Amino acid sequence: MSSSDEQPRPRRRNQDRQHPNQNRPVLGRTERDRNRRQFGQNFLRDRKTIARIAETAELRPDLPVLEAGPGEGLLTRELADRARQVTSYEIDPRLAKSLREKLSGHPNIEVVNADFLTAEPPPEPFAFVGAIPYGITSAIVDWCLEAPTIETATMVTQLEFARKRTGDYGRWSRLTVMTWPLFEWEFVEKVDRRLFKPVPKVDSAIMRLRRRAEPLLEGAALERYESMVELCFTGVGGNIQASLLRKYPRRRVEAALDHAGVGGGAVVAYVRPEQWLRLFERLDQKNEPRGGQPQRGRRTGGRDHGDRRTGGQDRGDRRTGGRDHRDRQASGHGDRRSSGRNRDDGRTGEREQGDQGGRRGPSGGGRTGGRPGRRGGPGQR
């Protein structure tokens, strides 16, 4: 695992993170009712589903686990039977006290009465598991993606959230595409709302994030990939081709779309993550921005680049021979018009040069910290 200083984007400070309802006054007849409303407490009671969550996490005896929102402790016990150490963060003081009493017979369980979003990830590899409150799902996903030593994150979320993030609708979110070189996103299965108490208004799902053993992109290449994805998800242009043409030459864009099997009129949300990587493979020319100069000595658009810089003087001298001054002026005027067209051709030629050389494909490496490329905090994206 890579160290935290390899992360291009620093983690937010602990004091910047907290449960959104922590300090909000909530009405209720009893403290229990108020806490359930304030902290979004819907407890999963189905033991079969609980066992399925623990199984999906694929825990190892040597791997510590962090859990958010243990509730009544049913999942916590299941995790403790499979992991070396389980640290459960419960923000509700009443529940935290009850859990410590219930789980006192499990020496490898630690109950922490604190907001999970303020926790620091352990320095060693670990797994995250939790049936998390719907209201802080995005914040917890962000926390997991930014944790430099996390291996997997298995969580119960709203069904809609899980489907949007894992492409279950055939659409992909910006967050998923941005982090795909570092993490796999997997929709595991639906969880019926009737398995919770109190029964929520919507169904849930088990979703898993798994850090790739070898990143598909890393370092500067990852940053350029994120920049490309960000460009397309801005909503400017109306389709993926129009968005890409804001930065990349037309011929290279057309070749990249063909290489990835993506139609020019495609909406970005319908482009699969692996297609984004194939697009990047063809588009990535870090040393040749749009409108840049081609390499010396390369012929561009049928004209030598040096000829364009001279404005056609040498050609004019050779072509006019013994013509009088008026003929040379007329010939020069014609050459200037032609030179203007050739400059346009030259830009096309630069695109052709960029397509022919310097292609960079997805590369493996040792980096696992990775910049997840998220913008913003809580709130579904």
Swiss-Prot record:
SUPFAM superfamilies referenced in this protein's UniProt entry, alphabetically: S-adenosyl-L-methionine-dependent methyltransferases (SSF53335)
GO terms for biological process, alphabetical: response to antibiotic
Region listing for Disordered, in residue ranges: 1-42, 282-381
Molecular function GO terms recorded: 23S rRNA (adenine(2085)-N(6))-dimethyltransferase activity; RNA binding; rRNA (adenine-N6,N6-)-dimethyltransferase activity
EC number: 2.1.1.184
Biased composition regions of type Basic and acidic residues, renumbered to the chain: 1-19, 301-358
One cellular component (GO) term of this entry: cytosol
Binding site for S-adenosyl-L-methionine: N42, L44, G69, E90, D115, A131
Alphabetical keyword list: Antibiotic resistance, Methyltransferase, RNA-binding, S-adenosyl-L-methionine, Transferase
InterPro entries attached to this UniProt entry: KsgA/Erm, rRNA_Ade_diMease-like_C, rRNA_Ade_Mease_Trfase_CS, rRNA_Ade_methylase_Trfase_N, SAM-dependent_MTases_sf
Superkingdom in the source lineage: Bacteria
Keyword field contains Hydrolase: no
Gene3D superfamilies: Ribosomal RNA adenine dimethylase-like, domain 2, Vaccinia Virus protein VP39
Annotated Gly residues bias: 359-381
EC class (word): transferase
SMART domains, alphabetized: rADc
Annotated catalysed reactions: adenosine(2085) in 23S rRNA + 2 S-adenosyl-L-methionine = N(6)-dimethyladenosine(2085) in 23S rRNA + 2 S-adenosyl-L-homocysteine + 2 H(+)
Record bears the keyword Protease: no
Recorded family membership: Belongs to the class I-like SAM-binding methyltransferase superfamily. rRNA adenine N(6)-methyltransferase family.
Functional note: This protein produces a dimethylation of the adenine residue at position 2085 in 23S rRNA, resulting in reduced affinity between ribosomes and macrolide-lincosamide-streptogramin B antibiotics.
UniProt-listed PANTHER family: DIMETHYLADENOSINE TRANSFERASE, DIMETHYLADENOSINE TRANSFERASE-RELATED
NCBIfam families linked: Erm23S_rRNA_broad, erm_SHROVE
Name assigned to this protein: rRNA adenine N-6-methyltransferase
Organism: Saccharopolyspora erythraea (strain ATCC 11635 / DSM 40517 / JCM 4748 / NBRC 13426 / NCIMB 8594 / NRRL 2338)
Lineage: Bacteria, Bacillati, Actinomycetota, Actinomycetes, Pseudonocardiales
Gene that this sequence comes from: ermE
